[in-house]
């Protein structure tokens, strides 16, 4: 079966990347792939063990010299061919049922904002809040490519929120999950 989602992971080769990729490999539904775009790495010849150890048929590697998270994510967006695009930072993890839940509960939506939990227990957006507000949402979302090529603003604070605002202008068919399936720095 073809992957339904590509996870775009900008990275500076943190040690936490291994844990991030492991959270993908632990998915109960195997229909995913990922592209890790190494920021500050020039060319396809990656020699750092932290970089080469994560490569597999489901995990592609790209390099970009001197980018910012928005620019680096845009490289991944342009490379993605799956129906859905999702985002994951290299020090975060996702719940093992993320892909399965997307496919079976949210596939009729155009984009999904997953509630995220910080190490201190803070959940954003808060459980009773079903709106997207600045500083109360992060990169814990995915969207369908049928909305068109939407890109992040380069080198800008708040690029995650701005991207979500672009999505909201295109569709009213979206959801904030009740599930907390994205873990920040876990």
Please place each PLM-identified region on the residue numbering.
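Short beta-strand-to-loop element that shapes/binds the nucleotide-sugar donor at the catalytic cleft/hinge
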Residues: 112-126
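Acidic donor-binding/catalytic loop of UDP-sugar-dependent glycosyltransferases
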Residues: 92-105
């Amino acid at each position: 079966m073809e992957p339904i989602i590509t996870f775009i992971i900008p990275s500076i080769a943190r040690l936490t990347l291994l844990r991030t990729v492991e959270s993908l490999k632990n998915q109960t539904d195997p229909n995913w792939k990922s592209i890790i775009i190494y920021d500050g790495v020039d060319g396809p010849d990656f020699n750092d063990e932290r970089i080469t150890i994560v490569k597999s048929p489901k995990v592609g590697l790209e390099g970009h010299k001197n980018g910012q998270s928005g620019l680096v994510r845009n490289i991944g967006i342009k490379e993605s061919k799956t129906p859905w695009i999702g985002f994951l930072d290299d020090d975060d993890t996702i719940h093992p049922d993320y892909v399965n839940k997307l496919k079976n509960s949210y596939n009729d939506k155009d984009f999904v904002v997953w509630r995220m939990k910080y190490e201190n227990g803070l959940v954003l957006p808060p459980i009773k809040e079903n709106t997207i507000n600045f500083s109360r949402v992060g990169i814990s979302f995915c969207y369908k490519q049928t909305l068109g090529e939407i890109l992040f603003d380069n080198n800008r604070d708040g690029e995650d929120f701005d991207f979500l605002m672009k999505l909201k202008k295109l569709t009213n068919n979206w959801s904030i999950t009740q599930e907390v399936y994205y873990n920040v720095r876990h």
